[in-house]
């Protein structure tokens, strides 16, 4: 066997979490290895051919702001860009794109192949090397030992993964690929709290056999907006998606065979994603509906495969054939790959610190579906943070942790390590208390400087960020120096309160009825401001009054987060706690008073008792 030098960080798994983890670690400067079964599956999109969406698009922008790879590669491979939620406020707009699977996979493999400080190793991970309770590396399927002081596990659905199609059970991490067994056993042996979750994927159809002329078609946006702050336009050819619906006949077939579904037959014990239910779940839970929407999503520009989003199932193949052909437009559809459900092991993320490090084993980090999440974007965000924090720890530096007022990444990780999961977790804008500030449009202004300070942002992005930051500051300052009386505003056709108070152009821009073009008619010098800067300034001004009020809430959050709790605190010594609250605090071991307050069931009275005890301990110490 070839000898490998010791690495600073080893990342196990070449999916979306693993790719971001390996890239972030390498960008920081750590000697990094990515261990994956096959180079050819790095960057594979195992389920839907899409990136972004409501909440998820915010995560992609944040990954990009920290110089991650997902957004840039999605721009290279995106074949139908759409901004979701346009009818609502900009804070909840969700960038999304259909993705050409082949283009994305090839772009990811090309990106990582020449990444400085990164070595790709084609092998499986059978076990961890542990000495004196500390991580020392990884043992491959070949028996090869790879040394490292930090290891990031990003195994997706591979931990004891098992595919279900009707009564069939197939050990697999995904279709056609073996599961990871030894690694799962090792995690159990560490004493980590673990469980089973499930997810599913629909059949893949031959687009040449679909009656597209019978369907409603959904085009891309006329002016696609890129994910990456480094890109100003999309050059990939855009395509349309089809929309169809299930029928009462579809539902009748599914109901007649419900007991043959792996989920309803009892073959699967793990819970599936609430917000991405199988078609059996939809029929069972929403019996009053006579149809459910199905999006027919092309998987590539030169690929005839179509992904029917909305009909994932674990029913037998012959039942799938029957019910699919009752859907308008799919009467003659040929199935290229049947749908399946997959059940897999996960670790209760409350076993992790906010740095995504395993509390019981320093040096071991987890990211992605192993932590109970679902989705490429959630995986990528965790991967970036786990990889960065592993690399920083390897060089003796403190972890980077975002709070809930800084980033959706902060919301995601705090939810996981504080509240845990009982079903696959996905991001929504509604999970963020400070979503008016955590917008997709300003992710770079929120996070890129933090990334620069953390050592994870390249010089090119840093330079572009500083140019944009200065342009925004200049535009804001100019708008705040230009003033107009209410009487003059009315003469320009603006409906404003005639209170005699002179207002700045910035204040006028906060009125919904007044846009930047209106201001430029009064102050022609504003026309010189670039369109990109104008777009963000308009959004900032619109929310300015709300953001000023929200600043008090953020300050309160930061005060609570500043009150740290010793990691070895003996909760049995705290009076006034119920047994339930005491057990929850022991399980999570919150690092701050703020985190303790977000644990389900922890009351204000319990927080007061906890705070008093911590202060007494500090005073005595």
From Swiss-Prot:
Protein family according to the UniProt entry: Belongs to the MnmG family.
Organism: Hyphomonas neptunium (strain ATCC 15444)
GO cellular component, one term: cytosol
Positions of FAD binding: 13-18
Pfam families in alphabetical order: GIDA, GIDA_C_1st, SAM_GIDA_C
Stored InterPro entries: FAD/NAD-bd_sf, GIDA_C_N, MnmG, MnmG-rel, MnmG-rel_CS, MnmG_C, MnmG_C_subdom, MnmG_C_subdom_sf
The protein, known as: tRNA uridine 5-carboxymethylaminomethyl modification enzyme MnmG
SUPFAM superfamilies, sorted: FAD/NAD(P)-binding domain
């Amino acid at each position: 066997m070839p000898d490998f030098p010791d690495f600073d960080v080893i990342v196990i798994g070449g999916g979306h979490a693993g790719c971001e983890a390996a890239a972030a670690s390498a960008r920081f400067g750590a000697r990094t290895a990515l261990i994956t079964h096959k180079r050819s599956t790095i960057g594979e999109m195992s389920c839907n051919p899409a990136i972004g969406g409501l909440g998820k698009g915010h995560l992609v922008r944040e990954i990009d702001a920290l110089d991650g790879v997902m957004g840039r590669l999605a721009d290279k491979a995106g074949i139908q860009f759409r901004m979701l939620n346009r009818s609502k406020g900009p804070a909840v707009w969700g960038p999304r794109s259909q993705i050409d699977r082949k283009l994305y996979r090839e772009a990811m493999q090309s990106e990582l192949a020449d990444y400085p400080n990164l070595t790709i190793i084609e092998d499986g991970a059978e076990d961890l090397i542990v000495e004196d309770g500390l991580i020392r590396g990884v043992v491959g399927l070949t028996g090869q030992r790879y040394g490292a002081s930090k290891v990031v596990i990003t195994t997706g659905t591979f931990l004891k993964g098992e595919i279900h199609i009707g009564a069939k059970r197939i050990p697999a991490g995904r279709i056609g690929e073996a599961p990871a067994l030894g690694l799962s056993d090792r995690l159990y042996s560490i004493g980590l709290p673990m469980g089973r979750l499930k997810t599913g994927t629909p059949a893949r159809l031959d687009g040449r056999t679909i009656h597209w002329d019978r369907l409603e078609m959904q085009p891309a946006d006329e002016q696609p907006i890129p994910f990456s702050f480094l890109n100003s336009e999309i050059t990939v050819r855009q395509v349309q998606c089809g929309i169809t619906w299930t029928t009462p006949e579809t539902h009748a077939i599914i109901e007649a065979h419900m007991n043959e579904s792996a989920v309803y037959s009892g073959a699967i014990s793990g819970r599936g994603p609430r917000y991405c239910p199988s078609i059996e779940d939809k029929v069972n839970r929403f019996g009053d509906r006579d149809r459910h929407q199905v999006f027919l999503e092309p998987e590539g520009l030169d690929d005839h495969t179509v992904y029917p989003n909305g009909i994932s199932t674990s029913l037998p193949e012959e039942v799938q054939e029957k019910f699919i052909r009752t859907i308008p437009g799919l009467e003659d559809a040929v199935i290229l790959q049947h749908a399946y459900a997959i059940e897999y092991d996960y670790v209760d993320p409350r076993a992790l610190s906010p740095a995504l490090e395993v509390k019981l084993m320093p040096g071991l980090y987890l990211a992605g579906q192993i932590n109970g999440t679902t989705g490429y974007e959630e995986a990528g965000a965790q991967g970036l943070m786990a990889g960065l924090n592993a690399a920083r720890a390897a060089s003796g530096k403190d972890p980077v942790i975002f709070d809930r007022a800084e980033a959706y990444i902060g919301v995601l990780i705090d939810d996981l390590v504080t509240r845990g999961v009982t079903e696959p977790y996905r991001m929504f804008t509604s999970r963020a208390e400070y979503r008016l500030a955590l917008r997709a449009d300003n992710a770079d202004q929120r996070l890129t400087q933090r990334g620069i300070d953390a050592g994870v942002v390249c010089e090119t992005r840093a330079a572009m960020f500083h140019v944009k930051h200065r342009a925004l500051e200049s535009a804001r300052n100019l708008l705040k120096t230009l003033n107009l009386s209410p009487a003059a505003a009315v003469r320009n056709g603006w409906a404003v309160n005639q209170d005699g108070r002179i207002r700045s152009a910035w204040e006028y821009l906060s009125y919904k009825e007044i846009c930047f073009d209106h201001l430029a008619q009064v102050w022609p010098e504003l026309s010189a401001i670039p369109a990109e800067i104008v777009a963000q300034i308009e959004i900032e001004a619109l929310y300015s009054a709300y953001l000023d009020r929200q600043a008090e809430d953020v300050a309160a959050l930061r005060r609570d987060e500043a009150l740290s709790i010793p990691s070895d605190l003996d909760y049995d010594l705290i009076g006034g706690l119920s047994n339930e609250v005491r057990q929850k605090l022991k399980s999570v071991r919150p690092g701050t008073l703020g985190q303790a307050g977000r644990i389900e069931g922890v009351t204000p009275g319990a927080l007061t008792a906890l705070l008093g005890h911590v202060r007494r301990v500090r005073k005595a110490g």
